[in-house]
């Protein structure tokens, strides 16, 4: 597993570099004398190591390959560990992720030194080579380890709650900035489509046009960072040429199709609309921080922390995207202003947005008029409060009584008290009676 971590990505880079070098040399009918030197130079170029070719300094390396390499290293390290991996194994994985690339770098330095007599490639500075390679792979490996052990770091290491709460707003703010920069590049490229097409056709044959197109794709992240720097109010320079929101300066440019995004005339007033990119990112950042905390001080502090981190990252990428380009001069963005303006826009717009969100959440709800209470007599209250009496012998009783069914017992005859029969005058039943003569009248019928 450690061998895969050490040499998987590095081996793929060397394999791809070998393929590209061989295809290029064969396509131009060149001999294979300097193949190894070209492969070593490609290894240095994709790791942002400055090179000197034929006495010309080449320090502007494309960022797309290094981003792909970083993603591959982080993915490999992420798969090599899990939240339950012990710390000793984690250290070994991290060390292996650096050992492999540094070993390849040492070999590339030796090859470049030998090839310098055959081709015009000079061996780069060893300290710079090891520093760039180690820095790139350490950052990628550390990212992979953090992603793989995030749950463990949160639970066991006690990562503060405020740090965990700021991860999502930070990622979202960066995504908006990148998307805004990409939109600016796309619109500028569409506006200069004819110029870009003419630059592609300057390659003459199919191989040349494909090469120019491939180089444009590789340098696309560099151009995106330059566009984002201009959108924040900083300046992007390409030798004597420079671009900002309020001024432009012309100068010679290499025939690279992606450079058609650079304006051919003076600055336009409509360019101020590009400020919507950092302002929009700041507004959404403030909203995200305010949603996570109802305290305006906590929300504003969160905004400023994220803005500071984004400003530092912008400055680092701005530095990595530039460098020397031989006779064309230096390609660069004004690093300090790019980082500072990124921080300022995010902090100011984010603080305003957070304050508005917190204020709206704290605003009391409108009070509704309650109906006037009705005075109820005490007698009615007592009647309503008293439970309704249920009839005992009523036939319509709806309550269900659970009882056990038993055999019916014969009822004992009730002993009725003996009473003299009373003659009811209204009875319809015949009475059996004997007619007797009244006393003193026994000889004849009564008269």
Question: Language-model features: where?
Answer:
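N-terminal hydrophobic or amphipathic segments with adjacent small-residue motifs
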Residues: 94, 220, 227, 301-304
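Extracytoplasmic/cell-surface-exposed regions of Actinobacterial cell-envelope-associated
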Residues: 127, 167, 171-184, 199, ...
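Alpha-helical transmembrane segments of multi-pass integral membrane proteins
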Residues: 96-155, 190, 194-196, 283-368, ...
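Long, glycine/tryptophan/cysteine-rich extracytoplasmic
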Residues: 1-71, 111-116, 205-274, 320-344, ...
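N-terminal membrane-targeting/anchoring modules of bacterial envelope and secretion proteins
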Residues: 1-210, 356, 360-364
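Core segments of transmembrane alpha-helices
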Residues: 277-281
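Hydrophobic alpha-helical transmembrane segments of integral membrane proteins
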Residues: 2, 6, 166, 271, ...
């Amino acid at each position: 597993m450690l061998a895969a971590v050490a040499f998987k990505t590095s081996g793929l880079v060397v394999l791809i570099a070998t393929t590209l070098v061989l295809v290029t040399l064969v396509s131009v009918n060149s001999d294979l004398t300097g193949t190894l030197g070209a492969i070593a130079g490609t290894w240095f170029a994709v790791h942002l190591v400055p090179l000197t070719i034929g006495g010309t300094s080449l320090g502007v390396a494309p960022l797309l390959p290094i981003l792909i390499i970083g993603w591959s290293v982080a993915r490999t390290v992420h798969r090599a560990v899990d939240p339950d991996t012990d710390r000793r194994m984690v250290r070994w994985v991290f060390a292996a992720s650096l050992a492999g690339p540094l070993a390849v770098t040492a070999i590339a330095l030796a090859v470049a030194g030998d090839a310098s007599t055959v081709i015009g490639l000079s061996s780069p500075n060893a300290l710079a080579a090891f520093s760039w390679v180690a820095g790139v792979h350490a950052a990628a490996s550390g990212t992979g380890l953090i992603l793989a052990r995030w749950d463990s770091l949160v639970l066991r290491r006690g990562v503060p709650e405020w740090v965990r709460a700021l991860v999502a707003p930070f990622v979202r703010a960066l995504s908006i900035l990148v998307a805004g920069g990409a939109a600016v590049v796309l619109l500028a490229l569409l506006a200069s489509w004819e110029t870009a097409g003419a630059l592609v056709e300057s390659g003459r044959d199919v191989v040349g046009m494909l090469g120019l197109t491939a180089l444009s794709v590789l340098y696309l992240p560099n151009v995106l960072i330059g566009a984002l720097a201009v959108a924040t109010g900083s300046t992007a320079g390409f030798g004597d040429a420079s671009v900002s929101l309020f001024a432009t300066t012309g100068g010679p440019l290499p025939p690279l199709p992606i450079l058609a995004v650079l304006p051919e005339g003076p600055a336009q007033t409509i360019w101020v609309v590009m400020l919507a990119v950092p302002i929009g990112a700041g507004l959404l950042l403030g909203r995200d921080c305010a949603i996570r905390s109802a305290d305006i001080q906590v929300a504003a502090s969160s905004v400023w922390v994220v803005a500071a981190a984004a400003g530092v990252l912008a400055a680092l990428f701005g530095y990595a995207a530039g460098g020397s380009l031989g006779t064309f001069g230096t390609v660069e963005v004004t690093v300090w202003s790019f980082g500072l303006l990124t921080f300022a826009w995010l902090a100011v717009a984010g603080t305003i947005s957070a304050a508005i969100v917190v204020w709206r959440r704290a605003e009391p709800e409108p009070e509704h008029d309650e109906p006037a209470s009705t005075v109820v007599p005490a007698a009615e209250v007592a009647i309503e409060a008293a439970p309704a009496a249920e009839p005992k012998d009523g036939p319509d009783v709806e309550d269900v009584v659970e009882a056990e069914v038993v055999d019916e017992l014969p009822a004992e005859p009730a002993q009725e008290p003996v009473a003299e029969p009373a003659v009811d005058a209204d009875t319809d039943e015949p009475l059996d009676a004997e007619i007797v003569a009244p006393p003193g009248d026994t000889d004849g019928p009564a008269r």
